[in-house]
UniProtKB/Swiss-Prot annotation:
Keywords: Allosteric enzyme, Cytoplasm, NAD, Oxidoreductase, Phosphoprotein. Its EC number is 1.1.1.27. This is L-lactate dehydrogenase 1. GO terms for biological process: glycolytic process; lactate metabolic process. The gene is ldh1. It catalyses: (S)-lactate + NAD(+) = pyruvate + NADH + H(+). Pathway: Fermentation; pyruvate fermentation to lactate; (S)-lactate from pyruvate: step 1/1.
Length: 314
């Protein structure tokens, strides 16, 4: 790794990977950006196309089609490779197929001498982040999944639409599995400086029934998009960009990534979406918010589903 030069390697040049790559070049987040794919011609074509966007970016990025050997000097390796979710298929349905692919990818990356941070986006992301941690042997804080960052963004966007407040001023988190058992932390939602419960009590224009419908739309958003256009990629591309910036810029920002629990929230030995502080070292710490009794039960259920699903592939 050259001094002052950030290198990011992207493994997987499908729709998600390329959406992320475009975001990275557009905002000039890293000085070096490497694309790796089993389809080398695709990776080369994407690198060529992206490099032609560099003159319009705020700062130069060197982009090229590389190999796993390029991971040796990488600060961050982002994996989006794997089989995509099909219409009617849950993220957990993908587990056995993508776990096998992942084990091979991670071994190849580690054989290069890689000693940076992993960021995983392939579904089921919580389980594949765990697989990456196990296969890599890296410290838990340097293996991170995209978790519920996108779900939390969808949540804030839809709540913002409902309350007619910009999403940057909606403070709300989705935690748990990135999938069907995720849950909203209603007890800690605030709109601007007002707690959600206070707002509901003050203004009968708003009600919990509407809010519950909003969460269902958040949870099922991927299904709705896949039914209409076949895949989701812009939202997750921006989510990965946000996590990347938090890490490379040493921001100490709080994002709901998939992080390893060892006692937090009463759970152990699982990667799952929780609020975590991210900086140049990866996950600095996991923030434990006090959950309501109902939220605690739902979170425990989410953990249980993940553990049962990943048992056969470990």
């Amino acid at each position: 790794m050259k001094k002052g030069i950030n290198r990011v390697v992207l493994v997987g040049t499908g729709a998600v990977g390329c959406s992320y790559a475009y975001c990275m070049i557009n905002q000039a987040v890293a000085e070096e950006f490497v694309l790796v794919d089993v389809n080398e011609a695709k990776a080369e074509g994407e690198a060529m196309d992206l490099s032609h966007a560099v003159p319009f970016a705020p700062a130069p990025t060197r982009v090229w089609k590389g190999s796993y050997e390029d991971c040796k000097d990488a600060d961050l390796v982002v994996i989006t490779a794997g089989l995509p979710q099909k219409p009617g298929e849950t993220r957990l349905d993908l587990v056995e197929k993508n776990a096998k692919i992942f084990k091979q990818i991670v071994r190849s990356i580690m054989d290069s001498g890689f000693d940076g941070i992993f960021l995983i986006a392939t579904n089921p992301v919580d389980i594949l982040t765990y697989v990456t941690w196990k296969e890599s042997g890296l410290p838990k804080e340097r293996v991170i999944g995209s978790g519920t960052t996108l779900d939390s963004a969808r949540f804030r966007y839809m709540l913002g639409e409902y309350f007619n407040i910009g999403p940057h001023n909606i403070h709300a988190y989705i935690i748990g599995e990135h999938g069907d058992t995720e849950l909203p932390v209603w007890s800690h939602v605030s709109v601007g400086i007002q707690k959600l419960q206070t707002l509901l009590e003050k203004d009968n224009t708003y009600n919990q029934e509407d809010l519950d419908k909003i969460f269902i739309n958040v949870r099922d958003a991927a299904y709705h998009i896949i039914e209409r256009k076949g895949a989701t990629y812009y939202g997750i591309g921006m989510s990965l960009l946000r996590v990347t910036k938090a890490i490379l810029n040493d921001e100490n920002s709080v994002l709901t990534v998939s992080a390893y629990l060892e006692g937090q929230y009463g759970q152990k030995d699982v990667y799952i979406g929780v609020p975590a502080v991210l900086n140049r070292g990866g996950v600095r710490e996991i923030l434990e918010v006090e959950l309501s009794e109902d939220e605690e039960l739902k979170f425990d259920h989410s953990v249980q589903v993940l553990k049962e699903t990943m048992a056969p592939v470990l």
